[in-house]
A protein has these predicted regions:
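N-terminal ligand-binding/catalytic initiation module
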Residues: 1-205, 437-446
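Glycine-rich phosphate/diphosphate-binding loop of Rossmann-like nucleotide-binding domains
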Residues: 195-198, 203-314
Length: 448
């Protein structure tokens, strides 16, 4: 990067190369906008085209997945693996199965993952993968055949010291198990190549809970700086998958009232607050029955708002845990108007750039996902460590390590994001802290 190029000129150069990748361009703009003033004060990070290199993945793998459905028909899906940066360690990031999956979404996720993994302080690079395969409505046998077909190509590109995938949207313990099983068969090795595995074959206690718990731990640290906490607060959560479920569980444990959950059909609202038993019932619904919140609401006499998002409901703490760009500028204005204290992202980039601007302008405590949802990948790193040492830690040990990591991430964000009167810009703090770790590693290793 030349000393005279402006931020807008740099972003135009990125857009010129990838004009049809809006999610990736959005992620790059969000990160670089907060990095630019830091770079102007620290010219050593303008050397060796560090930013240009970070805006270009090490490798993009795209391939066809052919599989047979229960009717004997051949189906074809597209799959990807984005290996973004191995400067700090092997590529690490989840696999997403959803019809919306495309190159832009996975490049944005891999880009964010490199910064997120750097924040954990664990030796992990960044990557992401997935397919436009939709597991909804598929039988277990169909999901198994698809996962096995996918790994027949993916296995060439992953390994315990090369690239270690995990789960994401549409990929839970079932899918990870099918992929890990085929990987073992093809590689003739039992090495840790996937994380998020079942406990019966090398998984870690607390891994399912880690992302959701981590979001709550991070929000707790943010609130503590304002002499606040979860006790007695109203919490709105979007989503009803793994992250949302355990964020709700931990929020209840901390004394909060969880008033919303959502899925693609709409939003479940319970003004009195969901009980622990109801949250456990949602886990059963989503993880085992694979049902819908609308049916759950009808059975339990709760309010369900079809086609609605949770952000119009008055709340103290908002935890967007569904998907990217689910919370827009108007949603953010509504939350601010209703007096929201804290927004901590459980999903990856769930807030649009406009929404982020609204939160920052209002002085709302706002944590970007690369910081607040890093607990999941951090615990994946702990799973890798346990596998390498051929041992397993107790749930309490893993939870204590997770809590300590989230505290460290928060402190790093404060270190780089603290402003006048003790206010913290967590967006700048997270982006700068992650960048410094990545950039120092890249500078030390030369132009490679």
């Amino acid at each position: 990067m030349t000393a005279t190029i402006s931020l807008e000129d740099f972003l135009r150069n990125v857009q010129r190369r990838d004009p049809d990748q809006p999610e990736f361009l959005q992620a790059v703009r969000e990160v670089l906008t907060s990095l630019w003033p830091f770079l102007e004060k620290n010219p050593q990070y303008r050397e060796y085209a560090l930013l240009e290199r970070l805006c270009e993945p090490d490798r993009v793998v795209q391939f066809r997945v052919s599989w047979t459905d229960d009717q004997g028909r051949t189906q074809v899906n597209r799959a990807f693996r984005i290996q973004h940066s191995k400067a700090i360690g092997p590529y690490k990031g989840g696999m997403r199965f959803h019809p919306s999956v495309n190159l832009s979404i996975l490049k944005f996720l891999a880009f964010e993952q490199s910064f997120k993994n750097a924040l954990t302080t664990l030796p992990m690079g960044g990557g992401k993968g997935g397919s436009d395969f939709d597991p909804k409505g598929k039988s277990d046998a169909e999901v198994m055949r698809f996962c096995q077909a996918l790994v027949q190509e993916l296995f060439r590109h992953i390994g315990p010291d090369t690239d270690v995938p995990a789960g994401d949207i549409g990929v839970g313990a079932r899918e990870v198990g099918y992929m890990a099983g085929m990987m073992k068969k093809l590689s003739n090795s039992a090495a840790c190549v996937f994380t998020g595995k079942g406990m019966s074959f090398g998984g870690s206690l607390m891994r399912p809970e880690a992302t959701g718990y981590g979001v709550a731990y991070f929000a707790q640290e943010m609130l503590a700086r304002k002499s606040e906490g979860f006790e007695g607060k109203r919490v709105s959560i979007s989503g009803s998958g793994n992250v949302a479920q355990y964020a709700a569980e931990k929020a209840l444990e901390m004394g909060a009232k969880v008033i919303t959950l959502s899925d693609s059909g709409g939003t479940l609202v319970h003004e009195a607050g969901l009980s622990r038993e109801q949250v456990l019932a949602v886990m059963e619904l989503k993880n085992v029955q694979r049902g819908r919140l609308a049916d759950f609401a009808a059975r339990h006499g709760l309010t369900f708002l079809p086609g609605s998002r949770p952000w119009h409901v008055k709340t103290d703490i908002a935890l967007p845990c569904a998907t990217q760009n689910e919370l827009d500028g108007e949603d953010a204005k509504t939350l601010v108007k209703n007096g929201v204290l804290c927004v901590a992202e459980g999903a990856n980039m769930p807030s649009t750039l406009e929404a982020v601007d609204v939160f920052l302008a209002a002085g709302t405590l706002y944590a970007p996902g690369k910081a607040s949802n890093a607990g999941g990948v951090a615990t994946s790193g702990l799973e890798m460590s346990q596998n390498a040492m051929r041992l397993g830690w107790t749930a309490q040990e893993v939870d204590e390590r997770l809590h300590a990591i989230m505290k460290d991430i928060h402190q790093n964000c404060v270190r780089y994001g603290e402003r006048a009167q003790g206010a913290v810009n967590y967006v700048e703090g997270a982006n700068i802290a992650g960048f410094v770790k990545l950039a120092d590693a890249m500078l030390a290793q030369g132009v490679v």
